[in-house]
Amino acid sequence: MPQGAPGFATRAVKIRPAVVSRIKPVDMNIVFQRLSLATDERFDLIIGTNIFLYYGGFEQSLARVNVAAMLKPGGFFLSNDKLPDTVPSGLEQVMVSEIPRTGARVITDYIYCYRRTQ
C-alpha cells in the first residue's frame, strides 16, 4: 500500500531483532487443535487477531479453552475479538483497550487482554 493512501492508516510496532529471533509462529486450527505442552513449555503470551470472527460462539468457546491450555498460569492472550465465556476456560478478561483510527471515518479497534487464572 502506498504511504499516505487515502482511507488507510499505517501502524507499526518496533521489535528488537533479538526478540524476533525467539518468536516461533505456529499454524494450527485453534478450535480443534492444541499443542500438548508440559507446564514449563507453555506460552507466556499468545496473540490471535482477526481469526475468531470466522467462528460462532460455540467454536469461540472451544478456542478459548484451547488457548488457556497452552498458556502458563498467569500468561496472557491478546485478541481483537471479545470471546464468550459460556464454558469455563481458566481465562479471565483483565483489560480492554480502545484504539481509535482516524481517516475518512473514525474506526475503533479493540484489544482484549485475557489472563490465565489456573
Descriptions of predicted regions:
Residues 1-38:
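Extended basic-aromatic, gly/pro-enriched interface segments that bind polyanionic ligands
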Residues 31-32, 82-86:
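Short "lid" loop at the C-terminus of a central beta-strand within the Rossmann-like core
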Residues 60-73:
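A short glycine-rich, Lys/Arg-flanked "PGG" loop and its adjoining helix->strand segment in the class I
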Residues 1-12, 88-117:
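Conserved Class I S-adenosyl-L-methionine
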Residues 43-58:
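A short SAM/SAH-binding and catalytic strip from SAM-dependent methyltransferases
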Residues 17, 58-61, 105:
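Conserved phosphate-coordination/catalytic loops
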